[in-house]
């Protein structure tokens, strides 16, 4: 009789225990920085620094048949940020300006011309994402302009209001999502069909940041499952530097503004200078 009674009561007892356990406040891991230390760190770091990855790579296309000087190139990116106001704004936000330039250089041709330059200045706010007294990520609200600086039929430009969140899952994995509202598309009204309305990315790094691997997925326009992909692998040259041997693979459209409606598949290798902790896409 006792055994039958236990059998009847045990599931309910387990359910009650599970509910009680679920109601307990979850402990936030200690490796997340606390808000006060982050605010002090922001005050102490220089207002000028690197923003996204800075790199120079060279490689060739897999979508143009055999390797030739016509489908091989060099690509480099320069990305900087500047905090415009030192003091903390309401809601613990920071006003900052960024500038990113991405260039495609046909170094294997005789005259070594620059094929395309894309300029991407932004103005926006950044703020920490918190849980309790810990900082678990960062968010951005920005106005972005991107163009190739040309005129006439070669002009390409668009403007966006972007919202981005970066969340650190644990010391190894970081995820981020970015969505935008495009406007002023008169130079290229169909660009969102190829560059989309948003992107997601994930990054894995070893605890000492010696190795990093990232994957970026940009959902193109439309309801079908189409996307642009970029995969990065980086190995740090020494334990005290932020310089990496860098491998990048791009597959999709809109790698450059001039060819936003042409498909490309490029594998390139070179060197990169990366921000500490995580890369911003």
Tell me the role of every PLM-derived stretch.
Residues 1-37, 278-281:
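Cleavable N-terminal export/targeting peptides
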Residues 19-61:
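N-terminal regions that are enriched for targeting/export leaders
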Residues 264-281:
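Outer-membrane beta-barrel "beta-signal"
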Residues 83, 126, 236, 250, ...:
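Solvent-exposed residues in well-ordered beta-strands and their adjoining turns
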Residues 70-77, 83:
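Long, low-hydrophobicity, solvent-exposed regions enriched in small/turn-prone and acidic residues
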Residues 21-22, 50-63, 70, 86-207, ...:
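Outer-membrane pore/translocation modules
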Residues 212-243:
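Glycine/small-residue-rich hydrophobic helix-like segments
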Residues 232-234, 240-246, 254-255, 263, ...:
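Long, compositionally biased interface segments
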């Amino acid at each position: 009789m006792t055994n039958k009674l236990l059998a009847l009561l045990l599931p309910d007892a387990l359910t009650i225990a599970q509910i009680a356990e679920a109601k307990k406040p979850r402990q936030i891991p200690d490796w997340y920085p606390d808000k006060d230390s982050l605010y002090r760190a922001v005050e102490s770091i220089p207002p000028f620094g690197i923003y996204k990855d800075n790199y120079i790579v060279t490689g060739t296309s897999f979508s143009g048949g055999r390797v030739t000087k016509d489908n091989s190139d060099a690509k480099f990116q320069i990305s900087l940020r500047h905090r415009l106001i030192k003091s903390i704004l309401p809601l613990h936000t920071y006003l900052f300006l960024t500038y990113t330039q991405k260039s495609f250089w046909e170094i294997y041709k005789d005259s070594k011309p620059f094929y395309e330059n894309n300029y991407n200045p932004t103005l926006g706010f950044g703020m920490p994402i918190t849980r309790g007294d810990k900082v678990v990520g960062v968010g951005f609200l920005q106005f972005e302009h991107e163009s190739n600086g040309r005129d006439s039929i070669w002009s390409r430009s668009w403007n966006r209001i972007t919202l981005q969140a970066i969340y650190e899952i644990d010391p190894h994995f970081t995820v981020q999502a970015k969505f935008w509202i495009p406007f002023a598309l008169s130079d290229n009204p169909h660009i969102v069909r190829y560059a989309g309305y948003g992107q997601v990315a994930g990054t894995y790094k070893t605890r000492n940041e010696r190795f990093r691997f990232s994957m970026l997925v940009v959902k193109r326009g439309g309801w079908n499952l189409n996307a642009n992909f970029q995969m990065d692998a980086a190995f740090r040259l020494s334990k005290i530097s932020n310089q990496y041997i860098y491998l990048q693979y791009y597959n999709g459209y809109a790698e450059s503004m001039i060819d936003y409606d042409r498909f490309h598949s490029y594998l390139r290798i070179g060197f990169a200078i990366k921000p500490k902790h995580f890369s911003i896409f």
